Amino acid sequence: MTSMASLFSFTSPAVKRLLGWKQGDEEEKWAEKAVDALVKKLKKKKGAMEELEKALSSPGQPSKCVTIPRSLDGRLQVSHRKGLPHVIYCRVWRWPDLQSHHELKPLDICEFPFGSKQKEVCINPYHYKRVESPVLPPVLVPRHSEFNPQHSLLVQFRNLSHNEPHMPHNATFPDSFQQPNSTPFSISPNSPYPPSPASSTYPSSPASSGPSSPFQLPADTPPPAYMPPDDQMGQDNSQSMDTSNTMIPQIMPNISTRDVQPVAYEEPKHWCSIVYYELNNRVGEAFHASSTSVLVDGFTDPSNNKNRFCLGLLSNVNRNSTIENTRRHIGKGVHLYYVGGEVYAECLSDSSIFVQSRNCNYHHGFHPTTVCKIPSGCSLKIFNNQEFAQLLAQSVNHGFEAVYELTKMCTIRMSFVKGWGAEYHRQDVTSTPCWIEIHLHGPLQWLDKVLTQMGSPLNPISSVS
């Protein structure tokens, strides 16, 4: 009690009352400063303090929006850290382990949600809900493969992979993503698989740092470069979280449950591993991500933070001047989030990052090997578990090789500073000075279990073509 008393000795009664509803016991001083800053803003608005106290004291009861003015870059500075206001106060009063704005979705009753770009933003923590990971339906593996595969979207997507161009295509975010995309392959009218949601692109999201992130970045992180249209953000979120309409009945209408073996998805201990390369040389050990929010940067971190993969620590005797110069420009690097069954890459570096993700390319209707440029301050969804689950559910009916082909979708390559592909003089990722390879463990382990259940391929996979 003595320590608590000394903590609140110079705290106003209003701040004391609001801190009474604080969740968790970490960062007491920071929470006090965050609440104090909020009280100063709310005192200027009649009834705002009362409405906030009502919401905090009666969580199950309806409450009104509690708003503060939106800053120029949408963020709020508390102490030496910047973050998005709704994330800060949801973290104080509801979820102390909240990592990112990607984990929050506004309720329908909220009139001033953060994503609506209005002059005021609602910070009522009970006007937001936490995005939950969708429950993926098990893949039903036929015990006896008598399925006659038709020309479906999956087959045509795979055929494109087999006829890969000498150099990958390039796309720049958000420019290449804003025009209505036409799928580069035609869809058979009899295909049981739906078209990729190419027109439903996921827009950039504001750079989040400070309280909404465990990394305590300085206050001068890049401001958001692009904000999504209101309806676009809402549509994408609601679509990606809808698990009610699974693909099983459509894919296997005439197969009884006795003829199939269900294989369920399980979350692994480490959701991904990251390997760092310089040109075609692997450097250092693989980083295994246990936290759902990981920073890969160019600095050194003597504290061995499990949420950070610091490339500045890694040495390579074969390093040339181009690599050295590129490493100096990695800076704050990339922030990887795994939220609600989706993986996002957020560019915190002053230089762009370049991503090759077959899952992302499928979603946007790009060629499978397309390399997407993500400028500083932008973030892009680079993997969606639900879309992968749908592709896997269909591919089991096309045989072992079709499922095995999906392993390529579970590896994402990302280059710092320097791009590669048709628009760059570097043709391959192994020609870029500094790049990482991200292996998604959950999807890979799911594939492994499905392949084990399927048995041997009809045409054994070998190195001989």
Swiss-Prot record:
Residues 13-137 form the MH1 domain. Disulfide bonds: none annotated. Residues 173-183 have a biased composition (Polar residues). SUPFAM superfamilies: SMAD MH1 domain (SSF56366), SMAD/FHA domain (SSF49879). Residues 198-214 have a biased composition (Low complexity). Zn(2+) binds at C65, C110, C122, H127. GO terms for molecular function: DNA-binding transcription factor activity, RNA polymerase II-specific; I-SMAD binding; metal ion binding; RNA polymerase II cis-regulatory region sequence-specific DNA binding. Its main location: cytoplasm. Gene3D superfamilies: 2.60.200.10, SMAD MH1 domain. Keywords: Cytoplasm, DNA-binding, Metal-binding, Nucleus, Transcription, Transcription regulation, Zinc. InterPro entries: Dwarfin, MAD_homology1_Dwarfin-type, MAD_homology_MH1, SMAD-like_dom_sf, SMAD_dom_Dwarfin-type, SMAD_FHA_dom_sf, SMAD_MH1_sf. Residues 271-465 form the MH2 domain. Residues 163-242 are annotated as: Disordered. It is found in: Cytoplasm; Nucleus. The keyword Repeat does not apply. It comes from the Eukaryota. PROSITE patterns: MH1, MH2. GO terms for cellular component: cytoplasm; heteromeric SMAD protein complex; nucleus. CDD domains: MH1_SMAD_1_5_9, MH2_SMAD_1_5_9. PANTHER family: MOTHERS AGAINST DECAPENTAPLEGIC HOMOLOG 5 (PTHR13703:SF36), SMAD (PTHR13703). Belongs to the dwarfin/SMAD family. May form trimers with the co-SMAD SMAD4. This is Mothers against decapentaplegic homolog 5. It comes from Gallus gallus (Chicken). The gene is SMAD5.
